[in-house]
Curated annotation (Swiss-Prot):
Catalysed reactions, semicolon-separated: uridine(38/39/40) in tRNA = pseudouridine(38/39/40) in tRNA
Quaternary structure, from the entry: Homodimer.
Documented EC number(s): 5.4.99.12
Name recorded for this polypeptide: tRNA pseudouridine synthase A
Record-annotated disulphide pairs: none
InterPro entries the record matches: PsdUridine_synth_cat_dom_sf, PsdUridine_synth_TruA, PsdUridine_synth_TruA_a/b_dom, PsdUridine_synth_TruA_C, TruA/RsuA/RluB/E/F_N
An example Gene Ontology molecular-function term: tRNA pseudouridine(38-40) synthase activity
GO biological process terms on file: tRNA pseudouridine synthesis
Length: 246
């Protein structure tokens, strides 16, 4: 039986989603251990997005297979019981067809990046938003968005260690909302390059600081060179919001 789960987590204390040989503090491995504790079955949990260390999730989707047909509420409650000491929660469980794959069946992924633009330090939003002291010209940031949306070669916006075969991606939506001092950047695509969202955010912030005009984003894009784009925004401001499968 294949189970599809929706997961929420605070990424602050984890090395990221994916298991690593030298470290057991990944969200994937912690979930697999929790599932084993109640089912006594070794499973592999496949996630829709392999979030980096510090990145949070409001609606990460994953799947795994069990030989036992449990009621979905039992699966949810049992996993959460064994996650009680971790900042991870399963918020929804459903049974699904065996041809469903959390990663490869995804049609669109949605991310949110949170910025707080003020001089005072953060308290409630500490490790949950990027504190930018310099006053930002949000209007210019919004103007720059049009040069990023659409189908492009995003070589300037990918990490050097990115293993994706192609730098061509389509950003379906990119929008900025501003309610001083809070700036929310929402972005969606079928898939993203490694660090693509965080580099886009870092570049938009540099535009907002006045380092270059909005139209310079086009030059950055056409350069196909990582050194032309802005800094990589911190991981702790990024949230994996949800995944569409239809």
């Amino acid at each position: 039986m294949r189970y599809k789960i929706v997961i929420e987590y605070d990424g602050s204390d984890f090395i990221g989603w994916q298991k690593q040989n030298h470290n057991s503090n990944s969200i994937q491995e912690i979930l697999e251990k929790a599932i084993f504790k109640f089912s006594k079955q070794h499973v592999i949990v496949y996630g829709a997005g392999r979030t980096d260390a510090g990145v949070h999730a409001l609606g990460q989707v994953a799947h795994f297979d069990l030989t036992t047909d449990f009621e979905t509420y039992i699966v949810r409650n049992a996993i959460n019981y064994h996650l009680i000491s971790h900042a991870i929660a399963v918020v929804h469980v459903e049974k699904t067809d065996t041809d469903f794959h959390a990663r490869f069946s995804a049609k669109r992924r949605y991310y949110l990046y949170k910025i707080v633009n003020r001089y005072s330090p953060l308290t409630i939003d500490r490790n949950r938003a990027w504190l930018v002291h310099t006053p930002l010209n949000v209007e210019n940031m919004i103007k720059a968005v049009c040069y990023i949306k659409g189908n492009h070669n995003f070589s300037s916006f990918r990490a050097k260690c990115c293993q994706s075969k192609s730098p061509i991606k389509t950003v379906d939506n990119l929008s900025i909302t501003y309610n001083h001092p809070y700036i929310d950047i929402n972005i969606s695509a079928i898939s993203f390059l490694h660090h693509q969202v965080r580099i886009i955010v870092g570049t938009l912030v540099e535009c907002g600081k006045g380092y270059f005009p909005p139209e310079h984003i086009k030059t950055i894009m056409e350069a196909n060179n990582r050194s032309y784009a802005g800094t990589t925004a911190p991981s702790y401001g990024l949230y994996f919001v949800k995944v569409d499968y239809s």
